Amino acid sequence: MSIHLETPTRSRELEFLEAVRRSRSLHRGLVSPPRTREQYRGYLKRLSQRSHLGHFVCLPDDTLAGVINLNEIVRGGFRSAYLGYYAFTPHNGQGHLAAGLRLVVRRAFRTHRLHRLEANIQPANLASIALVNAVGFRREGFSPRYLKISGRWRDHERWALTVEDWVARK
């Protein structure tokens, strides 16, 4: 399986929106990706800021399998970012996002010189917990009513990976 990362661009807008449409039931209550052209363009605008990096996880034939974003990147003494990610139907559950996340983690630590990545995951989202666990993240705690998704404040578990832990796993 040869997964690669691409930077989201306007040329992939329609393909992205179709993948989101096809994946609505998979994403329901877990994530709210851009669903309209206007929202997608807002997403691209956000990615143009220094505090955000976006990655499309692509199959060898360039099909979109998922998205992994580094959000709220803080540099200086903190050098940290929050992860946001989601797979697209029918590519979920096949290891593509795990392969993509390994590439994003390597890029975050080596290229962008970050020190820590954090993923906040709803406790019932066992697939997401398995994903970050497989890549080496550790559970740090529980945050009640942490993030508003689909109009509801939802509890989350806090998972993190530091560069030291990542290097020790290699």
Language model segments and positions:
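Conserved GNAT-fold acetyl-CoA-binding loop/helix
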Residues: 25-43
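Juxtamembrane/interface motifs at transmembrane-helix termini
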Residues: 34-38, 47-48, 86-87
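A generic secondary-structure signal
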Residues: 43-46, 107
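Cytosolic beta-strand hydrophobic patch enriched in CBS
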Residues: 27, 54-59
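A short helix-loop-beta-strand connector motif used in the catalytic cores of GNAT acetyltransferases and
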Residues: 45-56
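Acyl-donor (CoA/ACP) binding surface of acyl/acetyltransferases
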Residues: 1-24, 59-170
